[in-house]
Amino acid sequence: MQIHTAYDVMKEFLITDADLGGKYGIPKIPKTFIHPGKDTVDFAESFSRKIKNHRELDVNFYVDDVQFQRLWNQPDKYMEHLKCFHAVIMPDFSISVGKNGMPLAMCLWNKYRNHALAHYMILNDIPVIPNVSILPEYCWDWCFDGLQEGSTVACCTNGRVKSKAARLEFCVGFKEMERRLKPLRVIIVGRIPEELETDTEIINFKTRNQKINEEGVNGNND
């Protein structure tokens, strides 16, 4: 493929042989029928020596961007590490929209980076579960780009369940995702909004913070 910058500072090697789609040329991620592992751990937690059952776990990126920026900076350094796990949920660099959100260009850049890294993982024989950003209607013309119908997909509800308005917005976006992608199943990491109604198979995992909070409560009861 053609590299457009000296020393490939834009990391175009990540999208070698990628099929680009949508108005903004987002790398397409193939659908997968993979069933998730027994649990999921975030990228930072995946390095813990306490983890012994790597092959039963999926790695997610539902944490602050700073905790996995190093993957973007030096992707080759972490490919062998990620191969130790059952599968990897596509990276999730922040996409913040709305009145106080990011400029659209930043959202699109992070959307691109998520897909570029996922494509590179696939090139390195790592099973990847597509990650879907559930966003408001004015983002629907780009937020589903690069994702295929009929796949297992994943999403996270961090910051989406605190208020009823946020929960309802998530549910509306989820329904549109179902309409467009017709997912085989959806992995939801985090609390499921009580307002969500769906016939799609849902597999729910807790975030690291949920687990820590529950362990704290249980510890206080001892």
Where on the chain are the PLM-derived regions?
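Eukaryote-skewed repeat-based solenoidal scaffolds used as protein-protein interaction platforms
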Residues: 48-54, 58-59, 63, 71-217
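Non-catalytic, usually N-terminal nucleic-acid engagement modules in DNA/RNA processing proteins
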Residues: 4-81, 221
